């Protein structure tokens, strides 16, 4: 399974 890494804003 491909799990995309999202950039979470601070």
From Swiss-Prot:
It comes from the Eukaryota. Keywords: Hypotensive agent, Pyrrolidone carboxylic acid, Secreted, Toxin. One of its GO terms (biological process) is regulation of blood pressure. The keyword Transmembrane does not apply. GO terms for cellular component: extracellular region. The modification Pyrrolidone carboxylic acid is found at residue 1. It is found in: Secreted. Expressed by the skin glands. One of its GO terms (molecular function) is toxin activity. Belongs to the bradykinin-potentiating peptide family. This peptide both inhibits the activity of the angiotensin-converting enzyme and enhances the action of bradykinin by inhibiting the peptidases that inactivate it. It acts as an indirect hypotensive agent. This is Bradykinin-potentiating peptide Phypo Xa. It comes from Pithecopus hypochondrialis (Orange-legged leaf frog).
């Amino acid at each position: 399974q491909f799990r995309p890494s999202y950039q979470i804003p601070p």
